[in-house]
A protein has these predicted regions:
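Active-site rim elements
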Residues: 90, 99-105, 162-164, 216-226, ...
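Non-heme Fe(II)-dependent double-stranded beta-helix
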Residues: 1-14, 21-156
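Non-heme Fe(II)/2-oxoglutarate
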Residues: 43-46, 51-54, 188, 202-206, ...
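Double-stranded beta-helix
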Residues: 137, 169-172, 180-243
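A short beta-loop-beta micro-motif enriched in histidine and acidic residues
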Residues: 121, 150, 160-172, 223-224, ...
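Short, solvent-exposed loop/turn segments at secondary-structure junctions
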Residues: 24-27, 132-134, 161, 181-184, ...
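Short, surface-exposed loop/helix-turn segments at secondary-structure junctions
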Residues: 76-79, 147-156, 209-221, 273-278
Length: 325
């Protein structure tokens, strides 16, 4: 069993990240979510066909090839069915999302929470800033009209820059889970070691995207940039101030990861309009959420609320910020 040691925490505090090799078992811990996503893909393909967005169901293809093909033909629309959150804008009562039991159980995985506890303590809240990223080979995205960081390269950013300012003092921990192998060729994570020491950096509008996102200007990142290659079950822990991005997927297979966030109970999440939950509480164990159906309903309620009242902007900086010129 992998445990987080004092030396690991020291490395995290010094470098802004730590890689826990083999924290999760690829079959025991990740097998259920891989199985769940086969069903998610089947249902999504049926719905996309019914909506007239795709013509072919690609049933003859294996999972990896099929998901890549559908992402391409749907112009990225499939990603909404795969992600464990709602999009930043254009939410309606039919906006797809995934809130399945395997995803919920992974967020509550005891090995994961044992590790998280070493970083932020035993009163653990599941922050709703969370994503499933199934990134196809880059050539499948060559003709898409939308640039989505969940399926394309992820720009340089800090997770502290993707939420509202009320969470500036929240002790948010990012937990990045490798479902497949992640290496340089297929678009692994890149980090700027020690960049967390600089605090919150300027983020500017990314002109390459017609979907709302912001990135850190090149001049602020520095020369020290490190690729982190991982195997299935490896987990990367990141400070909310650590600058990071991902490389393009130049392989012929998907690169699949999840990034989750946790913070101490009672601290703002930075996305108050999305629902989090108590994942662990040693002081009040009865307050823990352990029913995936309740989690799913909380997201469905949020979707209905956001259909009537759109969410606040996710962006911390104005597009015409003079420092971005």
């Amino acid at each position: 069993m992998v445990e987080i040691t004092r030396e690991n925490l020291t490395q995290f505090n010094n470098e802004g990240f730590f890689v826990a090799k083999g924290l999760l078992d690829p079959e025991i811990d990740l097998g259920p979510i891989k199985a769940e996503y086969k069903e998610v893909l089947d249902n999504a393909v049926s719905d996309l066909q019914a909506r007239g967005i795709i013509k072919n169901n690609y049933m003859e293809l294996p999972f990896e090839k099929r998901i890549s093909q559908v992402l391409e033909e749907s112009d990225g629309e499939l990603n909404k069915y795969l992600d464990i959150t709602l999009p930043q804008k254009d939410i309606n009562s039919q906006t797809p999302m995934h809130c399945g039991p395997a995803a919920f159980n992974l967020i509550r995985n005891s090995k994961l929470l044992d590790a998280v506890e070493q970083f932020i303590g035993s009163e653990i809240y599941s922050n709703p800033t969370q994503h499933v990223r199934i990134k196809p080979p880059a050539h499948y995205l060559a003709g898409t009209t939308r640039v989505l960081s969940e399926i394309d390269t992820t720009v340089w950013h800090q997770d502290a820059g993707t939420g509202t300012s009320d969470a500036d003092h929240t002790n948010t921990l990012t937990v990045w889970i490798s479902v497949t192998e992640a290496f340089i060729e297929n678009g692994c994570l890149m980090v700027a070691p020690k960049s967390h020491r600089k605090g919150l950096a300027l983020h500017c509008h990314d002109k390459r995207a017609n979907y709302s996102r912001q990135s850190i200007p090149e001049r602020l990142i520095g020369e020290d940039r490190e690729p982190i290659e991982t195997s299935p079950g490896d987990v990367i822990f990141l400070s909310k101030y650590t600058m990071h991005s991902s490389l393009p997927n130049l392989s012929e297979n998907i690169r699949w990861s999840l990034d989750l966030r946790y913070n101490p109970i009672g601290q703002p999440t930075g996305r108050a309009w999305f629902p989090g939950f108590i994942a662990r509480s040693k002081s009040k164990p009865e307050s823990e959420m352990n029913d995936p159906s309740i989690w799913k309903m909380s997201w469905e309620r949020a979707r209905e609320n956001l259909t009537r009242t759109p969410p606040s902007s996710f962006q911390r900086w104005s597009e015409d910020d003079p420092n971005c010129a």
